[in-house]
UniProtKB/Swiss-Prot annotation:
InterPro entries: Ribosomal_bL36, Ribosomal_bL36_sp. This is Large ribosomal subunit protein bL36. GO terms for cellular component: cytoplasm; ribonucleoprotein complex; ribosome. HAMAP family: Ribosomal_bL36 (MF_00251).
């Protein structure tokens, strides 16, 4: 899980979601794409 100022979808499998008020990118195909806005 990378923490970034700006999160973007990196492939077509990435999903933008909101958990506990934080914007996150979760990817089912490639877990390296997981990001959290910090």
């Amino acid at each position: 899980m990378k923490v970034r100022a700006s999160v973007k979808k990196r492939c077509e499998h990435c999903k933008l979601i909101k958990r506990k008020g934080r914007v996150m990118v979760v990817c089912s195909k490639n877990p390296r794409h997981n990001q959290r806005q910090g």
